[in-house]
């Protein structure tokens, strides 16, 4: 099937123009895309590192302050164990128990346990209102302590239990009755008494059925007058949320950024969002945020139920963790978190703007490329049409192209070529006419002869 000249022109024009536009796009858009992608990746990296370093610094500072708060609380509580009257009464109790008969003591303990459960007023009175109880109450309320050594309002309010046991774990004094009478088998008692050697025991957060709340406890051995042997244990239980909240809940940034306290098993001790006692759902996060050194890490989830990647700053509480490691084998860690949506919001906005800018640039390149290609293709088309006319000998006027480049020079060369062809054709016609005249003359001469 024949193709019309116009169709050929359009095919040539469309193909060349398309190639020129495609070449311009490749030359222009590839470096642009590479630059934009590199800028986005670098910005993402910078934001992640800046946020990570900031989260780490916040975790370290908050952890340091909370570490000091707990150390101060431990020091103030330990002062109760140094009270001479408490030591005297417990030494007397020790001597009685060591000199007594074990079977008799066992029977007596059963009766006392029964009386405690039944809340016998005569039995409760010496424990909750006796000399030791009054000393405890005085220290608890700050009436017998120096002002700078008394418990703060916050820790006093967070205290849920404060009591003393003897060398057998039996209750000697308490500020109320919502505590067990026998404690010898309790892990905190075994750890603090430590077979008579004595050591500070800091228990992890757990739900206390008697106190009906999540608590952590501090247990300190009461040593005899020469500091040689433990003669009892002072046990203090705190409402975990109420104790930690003043140091943790007040720290926030952005809409969701906050700090929280967890142990090395991922149990939440205090958090403005998660309930105390809850375990972090994603177990993959726990080892990433509970090393023995401060730092920050990208995590597969945010530790708060979200599944998006996040950045978490962390640090152990050094002094407190030394005690908890000896006590329960776990450490306490400060954890700084912000929702993934808010954390990566600036990056997503940056990506959106980069995509918009890239789309606009792509459109501009197509538009400018089309205009530029048209300016190149149009004079070439004129030259193509002129070449066809020259082939037919029909080009009567010179080609006028003013592009100021090689195409204009090519048009001038085509004009010169056309002039030379016309001159050659004229000479050829003149020569042909001369030869034709000679032939006619010879023919006429031949006829006459």
Label the model's feature ranges:
Residues 14-45, 53, 355-360:
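Extreme N-terminal signal-anchor transmembrane helix of membrane signaling/transducer proteins, especially
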Residues 17, 23, 40, 44, ...:
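Cytoplasmic juxtamembrane amphipathic helix immediately C-terminal to a transmembrane segment
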Residues 41-75, 81:
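Juxtamembrane membrane-water interface segments immediately C-terminal to a transmembrane helix
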Residues 72-93, 99-107, 138-171, 197-199, ...:
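Short N-terminal helix-loop-first-beta-strand/juxtamembrane motif that initiates sensory/input modules
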Residues 280-352:
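Extracellular/periplasmic juxtamembrane segments that couple receptor/chemosensory ectodomains to their
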Residues 388-389, 402-434:
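Amphipathic coiled-coil signaling helices used for dimeric signal transmission
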């Amino acid at each position: 099937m024949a193709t019309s000249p116009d169709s050929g022109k359009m095919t040539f024009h469309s193909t060349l123009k398309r190639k020129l536009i495609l070449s311009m796009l490749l030359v222009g858009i590839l470096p642009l895309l590479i630059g934009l992608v590199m800028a986005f990746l670098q910005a993402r990296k910078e934001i992640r590192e800046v946020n990570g370093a900031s989260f780490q610094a916040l975790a370290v500072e908050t952890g340091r302050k909370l570490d000091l708060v707990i150390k101060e609380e431990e020091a103030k509580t330990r002062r109760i164990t140094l009270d001479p009257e408490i030591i005297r009464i417990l030494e007397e109790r020790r001597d009685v128990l060591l000199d007594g008969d074990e079977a008799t003591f066992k029977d007596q303990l059963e009766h006392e346990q029964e009386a405690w459960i039944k809340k016998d007023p005569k039995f409760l009175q010496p424990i909750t209102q006796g000399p030791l109880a009054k000393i405890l109450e005085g220290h608890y309320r700050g009436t017998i302590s120096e002002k700078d050594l008394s418990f703060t309002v916050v820790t006093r309010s967070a205290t849920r239990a404060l009591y003393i046991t003897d060398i057998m774990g039996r209750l000697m004094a308490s500020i109320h009755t919502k505590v067990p009478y026998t404690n010898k088998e309790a892990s905190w008692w075994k750890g603090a008494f430590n077979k008579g050697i004595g050591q500070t025991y800091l228990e992890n957060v757990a739900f206390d059925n008697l106190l009906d709340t999540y608590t952590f406890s501090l247990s300190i051995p009461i040593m005899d007058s020469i500091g040689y042997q433990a003669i009892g244990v002072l046990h203090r239980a705190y409402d975990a949320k109420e104790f930690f909240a003043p140091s943790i809940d007040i720290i926030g940034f952005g809409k969701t950024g906050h700090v929280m306290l967890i142990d090395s098993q991922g149990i939440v001790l205090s958090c403005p969002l998660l309930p105390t006692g809850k375990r972090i759902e994603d177990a993959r996060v726990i080892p990433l945020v509970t090393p023995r050194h401060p730092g920050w890490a990208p995590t597969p989830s945010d530790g708060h139920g979200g599944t998006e990647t996040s950045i978490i700053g962390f640090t152990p509480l050094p002094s407190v963790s030394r005690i908890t490691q000896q006590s329960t084998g776990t450490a306490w860690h400060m954890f700084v978190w912000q929702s993934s949506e808010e954390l990566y919001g600036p990056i997503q906005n940056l990506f959106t703007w980069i995509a918009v800018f890239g789309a606009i640039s792509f459109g501009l390149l197509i538009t400018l490329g089309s205009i530029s290609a048209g300016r190149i293709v149009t004079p070439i088309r004129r030259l193509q049409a002129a070449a066809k006319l020259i082939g037919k000998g029909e080009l009567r006027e010179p080609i006028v192209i003013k592009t100021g480049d090689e195409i204009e020079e090519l048009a001038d060369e085509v004009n010169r070529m056309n002039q030379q062809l016309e001159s050659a054709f004229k000479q050829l016609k003149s020569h042909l006419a001369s030869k034709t005249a000679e032939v006619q003359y010879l023919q006429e001469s031949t006829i006459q002869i």
